[in-house]
Amino acid sequence: MDLKSGKLAWTWALSVSIALAVVYASVAAPAFASTASIIAPSDPHDPQVDSGWQAGTCNAEPPELGAATCSVATPKQFFERAAAHPNWGFTQFIVAHKAPGETPVGELKDVRVDLPVGLSVNPGATGRCPLDVFEAGASGCDAYGAKVGESMVTASTPITGSPIAPIPGVTEVNVYNVIPPEGEPARFGLELAGNEVFLKADVAYDGNYHEGFTIAVPHALPIELPLPLGLIKGLILKNRLVFNGRAGDGTFITTPSTCLGEAFTQSGSLYSTYLLAASYEEEAQAGYTFPGSAQPPFESPIPPGTSPKECGTIPYAPGLAVDPNTADVNSPSGAAVTVSVPHITGADSQDSSVTKTAQVSLPQGMGINPAAANGLQTCSNALFGEGTKNPTGCPPASKIGTVEITSPPLPEGNLSGDVFVGEQLSRDPTSGEEYRIFVDAESARYGIKVRLTGHVSANPVTGQLTTTFAETPQVPFTSFALRFNGGAHAVLSSSPTCGPNTATTAMTPWSGNPPASPSSPFTLTSLPGGGDCPKSMAARPFAPGFSLKPDSAKAGAFSPLRLHLTRSDGQQELKGADLLLPPGMVGKLAGIPYCSEAALAAAAASGGRAEAGSSSCPGASLVGSATVSAGTGPQPLQIQGKVFLSGPYHGAPLSLAVVTPATAGPFDLGTAVVRVALFLEPETAQVHAVSDPIPDVFGGTQLSIRAIDVELDRKEFTLNPTSCSPLDTTGMAKGGGADPTNPAAFSSFAVNAPFQTTECERLDFKPKLFTRLFGKRKSTRRTQHPKFRATLVARAGDANIARAAVTLPHSEFLEQSHIRTICTRVQLAAQDCPKASIYGYARAKTPLLDDELAGPVYLVSSSHELPDMLVDLRGQVDVRLRGVISAVAGRIKTVFNPVPDVPVSKFVLTMKGGKKGLLVNSRNLCTAPAFSNLNFKAQNRKQLRVKRLPLRVPGCKKHGRHRGRR
């Protein structure tokens, strides 16, 4: 409150919170005199009727006839009803004085009063008097209904020490609610002996938001007394200020709704009022500043035995309204979220409790939109400045919305501002520290700022968002509205179905009563771009786009291979793929080490930026890259990843690991590792790729993946087929279906990518086959069972074999009596063929692998007259060659069809002799040369026929060593 030149001064205050007391108590003792040097003694632990400082709320003022004045010494007169409107509120201070009489020890200059947290003075409850009307004469304010209380002032002179007043006795004047100047939330004024006196209000938005008042007291003017005294100064000795708590609409003063129990009330200073004061003499000292140098403050607690009453009946019926601001499902949403709390008028009514904690959960499926990260910045705690009076310095690119708060003490629309993204402090989406929002609302007109931090917890599986504003200021509001930015970079995506989609809350009042849980359902009406709105998750459409092709289609050539999988907004999530590549579309694994399981685990545990800067997998295992387009709307976020070759996985002999550092603008969500198991169809060597479920939520962010692009571009890694036939990649794309968190509920969509090589007819086809028997001279005789070996040699760059048929000479029959044990279909499927079914061995060398493949040759069950021959090659990958054995014109013929379209530089097949030998000589082999027939067909349809392929026989003198054609 200001005093113009020559005016007396006084103050009014009620109570202040324990939080303020802690702050004051922590201030280092100044070198100057404190409040105790100007205000009469006051012991908060032993309050007396003549204590230098006291304040409170009363049932009656002035008291009934014969009753004592309401003071800390009259607890029965105190108003104890919580969240209600006291009949009266009073403050009283007495200036320290000395003999003779009551001579003040100094001239009061400044007074500071801090009210309790939660006690609200509502200047909007009454009319407000224009300042020019007040200055023309305070009584003119009566016409505006602006009277809110009375002031009683007693003055004393330093000469006589006798109490005086401008008018004999105690001076009483009306106090009016005056329209405050720019930058003040409220101002109250009174006119004393023709002088204007003001109380200037403020709100401690740099602390606990309690209300306070400041008075600047000018020098006292001389008072003319009868001679011989003449002119003397009248100094303030005592002031009692009484406010009508039910002025206007009855809600001028509202007691705190905080109810923490009587034990806490009596042990703490929750409902205390604090006073700081200083004299002219003190403030004349160099370096003295008010109120800092006046610490510590005087405390006026509520009287012993008093505490808030009727806590259980404090109303609390908050409301919630959520508007997605879009009619489309799975689209950018500039959502508006409004929490409301009724302001209950009426002098005899309890007002609504102030909200302690507001927790709002958006519907599942309405989550963070990664597209918002494009160009996004975050705001640090220091730049936000919560708990300070520093200007908010959040960068413009961190703004994601606006806020508007309506509070009963302020005209509607006067408290508004911006919503910013807070700096990430954690990678745990459930912590509320990974995602934070900073709310900065202010009113320059009324000098109030509200800075709040909302902690956003994101479900790591579903992406559902729950925002919590905890321990909110005990300041009443009727509406708290957040409006998030929409458009291409909207921070939220709308729900995936029509709904009703329901937002829920858990609203906890300061009263200590049970939380309230208002909810807000809303519906959507259409798919993005048109179409019927899906009523359930399973009803959502799913028709992804798909392509897989090499950069070059040249047959037998190495070429980068590209996969493209895409979906539109509104469709089911992309959850994976199960693909069978064309025969012959394979990879060269030679020289490539695996990224180990330990390295992949380290990648999954590392931050995205750390992984992007230094991959956990060795560079030597890198085979390609991946790009993920994430987010709803026209400008999804592009996220880059790497593809590494890895080892066995989920029963597959090897795998790919797609390692994607999940960095989105300023956010680091960690590193996503998605494995793709690479099976090999054993009889065609076709690659069968089966991905893990692709996360649709990562780090709590709902990814809304729009496209996945994988490029396998390592030099000489992916190899084209040598076939000229039309080929295709077939398989299934997996959608989120009825529940994107449950693979059993996924949907499937058949995909197909046709492919045909070029220039395949230019490939040569010139393989060579050598056959021979092993053993001593005896093994060449009739009825003997020689050991047999066939060796195939192929040239690099030729077309691969598609079918191989070899017919042995008439000299070699099948010894059916030696076919004793055959591997059954069941045993073969279980890879548990008995040892006795092994009749030979084979090995193969391919330029695609570092090591050769090798394994046994079985006789297996078949649908033919004779058992089939199965060559079971094992190694880095496993391949099976099935040969159909038959008798043609008295000769043994074996046909391998199909033969995988993969390059083989050398293949050696060795069949046992002796007791396990399947061949028996029909004559003495040394009597004449023996020739086989060869019929090879290439993948590009070229053929190689040899009718007289020599069989090399050991031990014959004349022709047994004939090596034949090559």
Question: Language-model segments: what does each one mean?
Answer:
Residues 32-966:
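Ser/Thr/Pro/Gly-rich, low-complexity intrinsically disordered stalk/linker tracts of secreted
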Residues 1-33:
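Sec-dependent, cleavable N-terminal signal peptides
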